[in-house]
Regions:
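Helix-to-loop junction immediately C-terminal to a conserved catalytic motif
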Residues: 54
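Catalytic Walker B motif of ABC-type/P-loop ATPase nucleotide-binding domains
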Residues: 165-168
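Conserved signature/switch motifs of ABC ATPase nucleotide-binding domains
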Residues: 84, 139, 160
Length: 226
């Protein structure tokens, strides 16, 4: 099973000549199938940590590894391949392409992997049915509700069956009813396909469903539930 881990991870920013430390000396190990929630106050560094773990940002110091491959040893193209073949992403806002249909939006990761064929068409249809958006397959995003848009975002993220799914406030822009539905779908897909969940969230209902809960406070990552 694949393992994503960081060792002695720190990140700071320079603002007007002052150094602002966001996270300091963080160590974390996540294996396929794990469910990890990271909470903390706004600005605590939750999203920053997710960005670094997902190879979308670089730490000031420390290392991130996927199965012993050091991200620091890879080129930008190498990191893109890591993300394409191992990671999925769902954000607070769906980030769908407005001029593409539901089906076309979901097909993007498969197209990037040069895997768009008759077999992948079956996979896309299956994923849409699992997330109850098959009847919307030809709709453009503007015709969808907020909850439906987030389902499409989840479908796009999991259609390639990634090993790790990064979730940055995935229920933050939804009402309670839709948030509950999205929460259930995320965990259902994780359990079904063994996808690890790594989420930054303020949603207490969402947090309570995770097996491992961490909090970033004072630049440190502390485990508060296992």
């Amino acid at each position: 099973m694949s393992k994503l881990e960081c060792k002695d991870l720190s990140k700071s920013f320079s603002i007007s000549g002052d150094t602002i430390e966001v996270i300091n000396n963080i160590n974390l190990s996540i294996t396929e199938g794990d469910k990890v929630a990271i909470t903390g106050k706004s600005g605590a560094g939750k999203s920053t940590l997710l960005q670094i773990l997902a190879s979308l940002d670089s730490p000031t110091s420390g290392r991130v590894y996927l199965d012993k491959t050091d991200f620091a040893s890879l080129s930008n193209d190498g990191l893109s391949q890591i993300r394409l073949h191992n990671f999925g992403f769902v954000y607070q806002f769906h980030h769908l392409l407005d001029d593409l249909s539901v089906e076309e939006n979901i097909s993007i990761p498969l197209s990037l992997k040069n895997e768009l064929n008759s077999k992948s068409k079956i996979l896309i249809n299956k994923t849409m049915k699992e997330l109850d958006i098959y009847e919307r397959k030809n709709h453009l995003p503007w015709k969808l509700s907020g909850g439906e848009k987030q389902r499409v975002a989840i479908a796009r993220a999991i259609v390639t069956k990634p090993k790790f799914l990064f979730l940055d406030e995935p229920t933050g822009n939804l009402d309670r009813k839709n948030a509950s539905v999205i929460q259930s779908l995320i965990f259902e897909m994780s359990d079904k396909y063994g996808i690890a969940l790594i989420s930054a969230t303020h949603d207490n209902d969402f947090i309570s469903s995770f097996e491992n809960i961490y909090e970033i406070s004072g630049t440190k990552l502390n485990k508060i539930y296992e």
